Amino acid sequence: MGDVIVLYASPGMGHIVAMVELGKFIVHRYGPHKFSITILYTCGSIVDTASIPVYIRRISHSHPFISFRQFPRVTNNITRNISVPAITFDFIRQNDPHVRSALQEISKSATVRAFIIDLFCTSALPIGKEFNIPTYYFHTSGAAVLAAFLYLPKIDEQTKTTESFKDLRDTVFEFPGWKSPLKATHMVQLVLDRNDPAYSDMIYFCSHLPKSNGIIVNTFEELEPPSVLQAIAGGLCVPDGPTPPVYYVGPLIEEEKELSKDADAAEKEDCLSWLDKQPSRSVLFLCFGSMGSFPAAQLKEIANGLEASGQRFLWVVKKPPVEEKSKQVHGVDDFDLKGVLPEGFLERTADRGMVVKSWAPQVVVLKKESVGGFVTHCGWNSVLEAVVAGVPMIAWPLYAEQHMNRNVLVTDMEIAIGVEQRDEEGGFVSGEEVERRVRELMESEGGRALRERCKKLGEMASAALGETGSSTRNLVNFVSSIT
């Protein structure tokens, strides 16, 4: 009878990739003879995409020690005026019987040493306990956001009689270990509206973090503010009870060679060969994640700012969303690039800029010698990819917990410059502000200092995963807790 670690991913490609990377790290360290990895995932979610089965087939082929178990299809309860997160959380709860039967089935032929779940899969926590399986959370953002999530039930308790956070324009919240407070309107998107069922779901999830056997985090100790690590370890984030062990095991990011297999070869080669011809650290890379998208008016402001800055740039432009206020795009249908940019922009900047539609191989781009800065939506995976590559950032958050990440990147970690967003206009950024921040990062002494700091952090990221590194030590401590 072999030993297996079972991982349970939330719906969506990003969540599955995160679990795969954790599984690969465990097996890379201990070998498939010590543990096999089984990843449970759902079927039928409204956030599923056609790329998920393609990705799973590829990983199954290249990493045979990772097996996947897909649950039977479940139908979403789609009700009018209910948010996508609320629908998704209800969908996850409907999969609880499949979690139970999967653990039962796997336990017949193997010893389940640990059950690792995503935060949104909290309804599976008591199921793991029911089987006496040590159950852990995998937190796929940084330690500062973990500190905030652990403390969120306390904030909920203190603000029960107030309006929704989205309406508290003059309110800020203090989190243990954070240097600067966070605007209420910049809280994680899931809790902005008290009347959305996702609000109470998120408070429930966060209140259960301390009830697990431990929390595994995709970051490394050297990246995080010491005050945040101390606040978590010292129990300040869970004032009403014990904090479980926390294991920082990152940075876990997808490998370049695996990413490149899914790329559009011709377009990829074009942008990479263009980068190879540019001077060292001279190019600003702009990319806002797989879901990040802007209305045409904002795209024009970005273009004007880039043109006025005089800097070299590689800019990934996604199709503008159908709803003008939305910042998320679903699908990458073709669109007229010239039509969404200022007239003549592409021609006027052709000697120093390149604009690509929808996608670029981000991990590979960030590691190019010519890249000297990164305008990012502050998704945690993108942040880690920039840190590993030693590239400083301009922080432009869009949704999810990205405003929280921005606060920490700019104020606590000091590895990014924040753009000034007009909250009353949906986070709009003017062309003048784009130019100002681009020049600050690429031309100023402050930008150079940021670049030096990021270069050192890149070296520390590599060391953390080495034989004697902090993340390897933390993985060893986690494995000791389950064997």
From Swiss-Prot:
Binding of UDP-alpha-D-glucose, residues: T140, A360, Q362, H377, W380, N381, S382, E385, E401, Q402
Documented EC number(s): 2.4.1.-
UniProt keywords, alphabetically: Glycosyltransferase, Transferase
EC class of the enzyme, as a word: transferase
Protein name: Phloretin 2'-O-glucosyltransferase
UniProt gene name: UGT88F2
Catalytic temperature dependence: Optimum temperature is 45 degrees Celsius.
One Pfam family matching this protein: UDPGT
Reactions this protein catalyses: phloretin + UDP-alpha-D-glucose = phlorizin + UDP + H(+)
Residues that, per the record, bind an anthocyanidin: H15, A400
GO function terms (MF aspect): UDP-glucosyltransferase activity
Its job: Glycosyltransferase that possesses phloretin 2'-O-glycosyltransferase activity. Converts phloretin to phlorizin (phloretin 2'-O-glucoside), a potent antioxidant. Is specific for phloretin and does not possess glycosyltransferase activity toward naringenin, naringenin chalcone, eriodictyol, eriodictyol chalcone, apigenin, luteolin, kaempferol, quercetin, isoliquiritigenin, butein, caffeic acid, 2-coumaric acid, 3-coumaric acid, 3-hydroxybenzoic acid, 3,4-dihydroxybenzoic acid and 3,4-dihydroxyhydrocinnamic acid.
Coiled-coil spans in chain: none
Annotated active site: H15 (proton acceptor), D118 (charge relay)
Family: Belongs to the UDP-glycosyltransferase family.
UniProt pH dependence: Optimum pH is 8.0.
CDD domains (alphabetical): GT1_Gtf-like
